[in-house]
A protein has these predicted regions:
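Catalytic cores of Mg2+-dependent Asp-rich isoprenoid enzymes
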Residues: 3-84, 89, 93-203
Length: 203
């Protein structure tokens, strides 16, 4: 990094009280994908991955937004996991093409899927039995994050609320489509995107 970027980093850390461990968690999350492709992690590892690649970013962001410490940490916890689980459900086939499978091992076994080859898992007829409870877990995290945002100022939660509404729309489309193969990609319509921005960013 240049001297100026380093100075800006130090100034931001001091101004907003950003935590060094959150920056390191983000790096750790990226490194989880590097040494070997993730395939059917256990639930604890999946949750750790979600924390590192999503919630850690949230913990840094909420301090900049000006949320109270406790609510900010809880919002980062729940919204980060909601967004990342939605990403996992949306990108099942794309990830499989890269040799990755983020669906939890315990739930695959419970559904009778013992193979961890991404291509075979994503074609398995029992896959919806794994994806449906994961979608419910994402919905729970969305609900918890909504409760936190409701009790904080509209200005402080503007950015996280927009992200929440957009990703919740994706999750709803995924649930409506279902998770059996073949899975058509889902996209939030332009009208829906504009509606979210008008309601939560402008009005």
């Amino acid at each position: 990094p240049t001297r100026r970027s380093s100075d800006l980093y130090v100034a931001s850390v001091k101004t907003f009280g950003l935590k060094r461990e959150d920056f390191l968690a983000i790096v750790d999350g990226m490194e989880m994908d590097v040494p070997q492709d993730i395939r059917a992690p256990d639930l604890a590892t999946l949750d750790l991955y979600c924390d590192r690649v999503a919630s850690a970013v949230g913990r840094l962001s909420v301090r900049v937004f000006g949320l109270p410490e406790d609510d900010g940490i809880q919002l980062a916890h729940h919204l980060g996991r909601a967004l990342q689980l939605t990403n996992i459900l949306r990108d099942i086939d794309e990830d499989a093409g890269l040799g990755r499978l983020y669906l939890p091992r315990e739930w695959l076994w419970h559904a009778g899927i013992t193979n961890n080859d991404p291509a075979r898992v994503t074609a398995d007829r029992a896959l919806p039995k794994v994806c449906a409870p994961l979608a419910e877990r994402a919905k729970m995290h969305f609900q918890k994050s909504d409760e936190i945002m409701e009790r904080n100022s509209r200005r402080a939660v503007r950015a996280p609320r927009i992200m929440s509404k957009y990703y919740r729309a994706i999750l709803d489309l995924l649930i409506a489509r279902g998770f059996a193969a073949p899975r058509a990609p889902v996209r939030v319509s332009k009208a829906a995107k504009i509606g979210i921005l008008l309601r939560y960013a402008i009005i």
